[in-house]
């Protein structure tokens, strides 16, 4: 061993060899660190770094399963783009969370910082009108559906315009418009109605869709309305309505409360409550177009 050491010293290689060993060791440590981090990101545990939402799919248009809080941890299952599929440690719940809410150092989508409705064309369809009065209440106020769908659409139009959206109305006054003539092109179509039944017990909001391409918009708007509105949430449902069937764009039909229910009717008549629902619709559209 002494002979080897003497030979290395004689030829000036001892210091070089030491340097090479140190360099190799440093490279090894770097590779080990990268491997550990990669393994943790690909198959390990992730931590939520700020309050977020667990969703049924990998973008903001999917419905929320439940809210998750900063500090919670999950098992990572998969990744699509900037969205991470996770499972709770009990193995009872799976869903998707935006990667920028986790410790994986994924940058947020740039679209989230801009206005997602700017330049979008939203078609608002106030149900009924003119000789077609729609549903009516049995209370002394005798509320007519056609009047409140138009009020809601006009108020909603103002909110959407403030967000930079271009709004088309199938009617802007009390006139009859056929279902065929309500087929107007845009980026999204929203038909506004109030429900009614012979029984005064039925109540709440229902969001209808028909074609598969319409379901995501329906679920997003339903989730947004559920967060803010005081009305009972009846969910999103598939229904073969002509205004949904005849269009090729994302479209929904909103039944914003039962005019035949006294409690719902009072909220439909209340401008402040309508504004809450209208803002929820705007929020849902922003969320839908951000995905």
From Swiss-Prot:
Enzyme class per UniProt: hydrolase
The EC number(s) this enzyme carries: 3.5.1.-
InterPro entries: LytH, MurNAc-LAA_cat, N-acetylmuramoyl_amidase_3, SH3-like_bac-type
TM ranges: none
Function according to Swiss-Prot or TrEMBL: Probably involved in cell-wall metabolism.
Keywords for this protein: Cell wall biogenesis/degradation, Hydrolase, Secreted, Signal
Annotated SH3b domain residues: 41-105
Domain spans labelled MurNAc-LAA: 122-286
Family: Belongs to the N-acetylmuramoyl-L-alanine amidase 3 family.
Signal peptide positions (record): 1-40
SUPFAM superfamilies associated with the record: Zn-dependent exopeptidases
Gene (name only): lytH
SMART domains: Ami_3, SH3b
UniProt feature, compositional bias: Polar residues: 133-142
Protein name as catalogued: Probable cell wall amidase LytH
Location in or out of the cell: Secreted
Region (Disordered): 123-147
Molecular functions (GO terms): N-acetylmuramoyl-L-alanine amidase activity
GO cellular component: extracellular region; outer membrane-bounded periplasmic space
Pfam family, one: Amidase_3
Main location: secreted
Species per Swiss-Prot/TrEMBL record: Staphylococcus epidermidis (strain ATCC 12228 / FDA PCI 1200)
A biological process from GO: peptidoglycan catabolic process
């Amino acid at each position: 061993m002494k002979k080897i050491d003497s030979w290395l010293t004689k030829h000036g290689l001892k210091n070089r060899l030491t340097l090479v060993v140190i360099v190799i060791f440093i490279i090894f440590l770097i590779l080990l660190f990268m491997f550990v981090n990669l393994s943790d990101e690909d198959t390990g545990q992730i931590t939520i770094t700020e309050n977020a939402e667990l969703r049924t799919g990998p973008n903001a248009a999917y419905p929320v399963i439940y809210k998750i809080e900063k500090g919670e941890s999950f098992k990572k299952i998969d990744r699509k783009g900037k969205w991470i599929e996770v499972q709770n440690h009990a193995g009872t719940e799976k869903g998707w969370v935006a990667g920028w809410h986790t410790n994986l150092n994924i940058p947020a989508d740039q679209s989230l910082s801009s206005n997602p409705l700017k330049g979008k064309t939203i078609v608002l369809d106030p149900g009924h009108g003119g000789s077609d009065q729609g549903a009516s209440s049995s209370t002394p106020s005798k509320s007519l559906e056609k009047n409140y769908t138009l009020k809601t659409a006009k108020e909603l139009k103002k909110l959407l315009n403030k967000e930079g959206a271009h709004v088309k109305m199938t009617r802007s006054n009390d006139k009859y418009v056929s279902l065929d003539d309500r087929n107007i092109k845009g980026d999204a179509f929203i038909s506004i109605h109030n429900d009614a039944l012979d029984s005064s017990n039925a109540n709440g909001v229902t969001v209808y869709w028909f074609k598969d391409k319409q379901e995501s918009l329906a679920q997003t708007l339903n989730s947004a309305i559920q967060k803010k509105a005081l009305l009972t949430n009846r969910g999103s449902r598939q229904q073969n309505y002509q205004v949904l069937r005849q269009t090729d764009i994302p479209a929904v039909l909103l039944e914003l409360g039962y005019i035949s229910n006294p409690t719902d009717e009072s909220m439909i008549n209340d401008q402040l409550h309508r504004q809450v629902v209208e803002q929820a619709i705007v929020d849902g559209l922003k969320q839908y177009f951000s995905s």
